[in-house]
């Protein structure tokens, strides 16, 4: 075989050669050989950019691409011109300003960049990005005084705390301690909160001495307490920090004095009292700490003896015992469940707090004592004897009881507990927990029964119907899902008309997601009737036809993809669907049907809404002839007169060109019939 024979190419090879070549076709490289070709190529590119901007001059990204092109051609004059034109279109676009500045900096034209930042910050003084860009540029150039001036000008606008922090960091890097103090003196006036003062304190701790730190703390306390409406939490945070710092300086008397003055001013503050106790516990010796704890314990006991229904005091008392007297905690918990029984017969905040005391007791029995039998018996007492289930209940108690049994690996008991709760005192929260539990266990038959019970309990709640239908949809049983939707839409379903309309919307979405477009179209017809022929529903129905494939398109896809997997059909429709003339004609047919309905019902308002929607649709998808035709059918306002109670009044009415055309056609038909009859009667 010769070399020529080896290189012969057959027709079969030519046909099969493209197969297997994946990937997009690479763009063609343009070889520019001389300056004239370069100028011609640049002229074509500029024409392309200009044409694109003529079509949409508000496309900021196109402006930026245009400017980047000019910069790449080393034509800064044209690049600046493009940027300036872009700013004329979108002067408030921060990205354009930043790209413009970056372009000038890359071109090493610092003065132009500086002038741009001056313009930008003057036009958009509240945009922090521009200020940060300004100071970063000047600092990178070593212009310390200019940076300080920019920060000073920026801070006159009272920006957010981050800007002040950046100013402080800059002065700290320069080693200008006094300048930092001046910045902080203005910073705390603009943002007079504890966090700002504590930043100043942290600075003085590092760069100052004990005297400067103490002066800042004192000034902070005086400033915050001078305001009548000062936030107590802010003051507490500052005072506690002041006292802790004094203690670290071994100034215990000063620390006690700070806390004492604060407690005398805010005697109800538990934070200040706790800080005082912690100080004494840490620096006052073991005896002092114990005396404080015993004193607090005695005060709580006296308070609870006088007011046994003070549940907040019970909670604080139990916290104290848990932390410092753990041996007494069990007895106190049991005592709380006995002495603190609410007197009211209604579910109020007292009952909620009392049940929370019970639940704390039960968690103690389970986790600390690890006595499952006692815990179980106390749970039974709570849900059967303590809580008046005939009047109200607490779903949290039942759920925690069931979770306890699950932790004990007693799933059957947990189910019985939840079933008992639904039988004695059904609540949506209990149903939802039980349903979620069975879903996790994949017991879907039980889930179905629970959903049915929930619908019997609350048939008027829309979410119950939707969640049940979505369960069947997720399980792949579309027929059961349809049955649930259909029952919900019946009069026996229990839903109001407004909720039936919402359920119908979800039903249509379900059929659409399942690619059952014909079913969805039939549902839309029912939806229109159910809504009382609402114009918005008519419009939605019409536009739906332009968003889904027609029957012919579905059949064509099924023919082209006979072995396609059903699970991917929705994605395939979304990828392959294209709006065709058939879609448009179906949409127009529904618009026309709606117009005929409102014309026969003499509903001008509905007719106007449909005509306007029809016009909007044609403006997007219609031809020039279609747009002109629908525009000619729009109603005109006319002023007419009528007599009411003997008084002539003017009112605004609408004239529809369609009515005039139909009247003229009827009249012409009548005349033609009369002429024909006359001819027939002639001898």
Swiss-Prot record:
It comes from the Eukaryota. GO terms for biological process: cis assembly of pre-catalytic spliceosome; DNA replication initiation; mRNA splicing, via spliceosome; spliceosomal complex assembly. Pfam families: HAT_Syf1_CNRKL1_N (PF23233). HAT repeats lie at residues 40-72, 74-106, 108-140, 142-173, 175-206, 291-323, 336-367, 374-407, 409-440, 442-474, 476-513, 515-547, 582-620. SMART domains: HAT. Its main location: nucleus. Involved in pre-mRNA splicing and cell cycle progression. Required for the spliceosome assembly and initiation of the DNA replication. Associated with the spliceosome. One of its GO terms (molecular function) is DNA replication origin binding. This is Pre-mRNA-splicing factor CLF1. It is found in: Nucleus. Keywords: mRNA processing, mRNA splicing, Nucleus, Repeat, Spliceosome. SUPFAM superfamilies: TPR-like (SSF48452). The keyword Ubl conjugation does not apply. The gene is CLF1. InterPro entries: HAT, HAT_Syf1-like_N, Syf1-like, TPR-like_helical_dom_sf, TPR_rpt. One of its GO terms (cellular component) is U2-type post-mRNA release spliceosomal complex. It comes from Eremothecium gossypii (strain ATCC 10895 / CBS 109.51 / FGSC 9923 / NRRL Y-1056) (Yeast). Belongs to the crooked-neck family.
